[in-house]
Amino acid sequence: GIADAGWTAIGLAIGTYLNWKIVAKRIRLYTHVAGNSITLPSFFSNRFRDDRRILQSIGAIFIVIFFIPYTASGFAACGKLFSSLFGVKYLTAMIISALIIVGYTTLGGFLAASTTDFIQSIIMSIALIIVFGFGVSVAGGPDAVISHAKSLPGYLTMMTTYNPETGTEAAYPLINIVSMLAWGLGYFGMPHILLRFMAIEDEKKLSLSRRVATTWVVISLAVAVMIGVIGLGMTEAGELEMLHGANSETIIVKIADLLSTHGVLPALLGGTILAGILAST
């Protein structure tokens, strides 16, 4: 059902808004007061007048420790994507991807990272639109997609879920709701997000930025949830095989593969989708 993805999307949207509302302006103003700090560790040291730079060292250690698995997961995703696309060894694809990412980040610094974020957001938006439109078309139209989803008990509700093994609906546990909503708390401690708050040129632009960011998150996550429902409709139409468990997360890749079999232009569009997946890692 949509409960897992739906509650996660709600949590991420709320977390995005509250992070911009509560943290953004404060950290931007205090960054200016604290010697125009350009990193979180230096901000903590300057903010609390830590002349011995103990806070800076501790902050840097924590970021390194917790960002190793975070960045490693991104490198692993790149390796899996290129390995499946081009048939190269996974380790080779991962190393090449890591070298490219680390290279442009090192050479271009924060400006390069911010610029690529902007470009990647555009690519991801285009990819979502293509997947959404193509999926609905192949599944037989919006009515067919919704009709099939409604035929599964509990599939389209947020308080129940569909059990494919028994074909019945089951109550969605409260602990699961809380766990999914808690995803939004992660935004408050992400250094790469807080750095963008610190770097904004004028705090007066934060209100507009908050509206744009929240709107983008709500729309993109809503479309992402709907793509899962569309994938179910495509399965019912016989265009895709049923995906179970963790494999259900590959639905966008499956749709891109299907799209690429319809000619040269669709193949290029499929490449755009895969680029969007890569951009999101």
PLM region descriptions:
Residues 1-11, 45, 122-270:
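Loop-to-helix junctions at membrane interfaces in multi-pass transport proteins
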Residues 7-105, 182-186, 195, 274-281:
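Helix-loop-helix module between adjacent transmembrane segments
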Residues 2, 90-91, 109-110, 118, ...:
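Membrane-helix interface/capping residues of multi-pass secondary transporters
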Residues 22, 86, 107, 133-137, ...:
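Helix-loop junctions at the membrane-solvent interface of multi-pass transporters
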Residues 105-106, 210:
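N-terminal amphipathic, basic-rich helices that act as targeting or association modules
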